[in-house]
Design a protein with these regions (language model features):
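Bulky hydrophobic/aromatic content
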Residues: 1-87
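Polybasic (Lys/Arg-rich)
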Residues: 157-255
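Structural motif
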Residues: 106, 113, 133-135, 229
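Flexible linker/loop signature enriched in Pro/Ser/Thr and Pro/Gly
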Residues: 123-160
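Loop-centered beta-sheet repeat module
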Residues: 65-127
């Protein structure tokens, strides 16, 4: 029953599963247990999270699974919110709907959202797209681009565990060795976010330095989120960029 409870909780708090489909899945899970478990599960309520309203999310996952298995490219359209709080297909400057041709490699869940890890055909790097925002997807006959040929791949096959550890916010940019200084109260937060592969050094009663190989934009966002308790030390280009960005933020709040 405890295992079923964990599965049901994952349905309740998942942002990538539409509410109606989540309810159906929960009923199926409940049917695997006894009446006592069902009487307890009625008292479990989800937080008021913003859930996807894309009813085709499972179809998208099935198509992407098939394309990954066959090593084929896919074509899709991509949606985003506008100020009317509704999803709209992304368009080109001429007003036509923009189409994306990509090679899919993996799908992963991060912070309750399903992401597609792929290569956008025009470039030689890695891109991440929200699966619930994909529309009108179809598999193409064209063979996909091998992951080993991409920039930043190191000519190695994709390691999903390593990729997720280095891309904590699912940004697609270059990885780097980053060193930052934190207050010691944040040690647990750092390990939760970056894993136990981090290295600690230069420890004092109040602060410690952290070194980690991570996506550079993720490190930048982390430092902004937790400033001034996190200070980037290296690389210098990232430290300089953060200093300039924080200066602009300060100026934006000046009267």
């Amino acid at each position: 029953n405890e295992e079923l409870r964990l599965l049901i909780d994952s349905m309740l708090f998942s942002k990538h599963i539409p509410y109606s489909q989540a309810k159906e899945l929960i009923k199926k899970l409940e049917s695997l247990s006894n009446i006592y478990f069902k009487s307890c599960s009625q008292y479990i309520y989800p937080l008021p999270v913003e859930r996807t309203d894309n009813k085709q999310v499972f179809y998208n996952i099935a198509i992407l699974d098939d394309a990954i298995r066959k090593k084929k490219k896919v074509l899709f359209e991509y949606a985003e919110y506008h100020t009317d709080k509704k999803m709209h297909l992304k368009k080109r400057e001429d007003g036509s709907v923009r189409e994306y041709i990509i090679t899919p490699y993996q799908m992963a869940v991060q912070e309750g959202k399903y992401y597609l890890i792929c290569n956008y055909d025009k470039y030689d790097d890695i891109s991440n797209y929200r699966v619930d925002r994909i529309r009108n997807i179809q598999i193409l006959e064209e063979k996909g681009k091998p992951f080993e040929t991409l920039k930043w791949s190191g000519h190695q096959p994709m390691n999903l565990n390593e990729y997720m550890r280095e891309h904590v916010y699912m940004y697609s940019s270059e990885n780097a060795f980053v060193k930052f200084r934190i207050v010691k109260a944040m040690i647990s937060d750092v390990i939760d976010l970056f894993g136990k592969g981090v290295n600690f050094s230069e420890e004092t009663d109040t602060h410690v330095s952290v070194s980690v190989h991570v996506n550079e934009r993720a490190a930048e966002q982390f430092a902004k989120n937790y400033a001034p308790d996190v200070v980037i030390l290296q690389p210098k280009r990232l430290r300089d960029k953060l200093r300039d960005d924080l200066k602009k933020s300060w100026e934006a709040y000046e009267d």
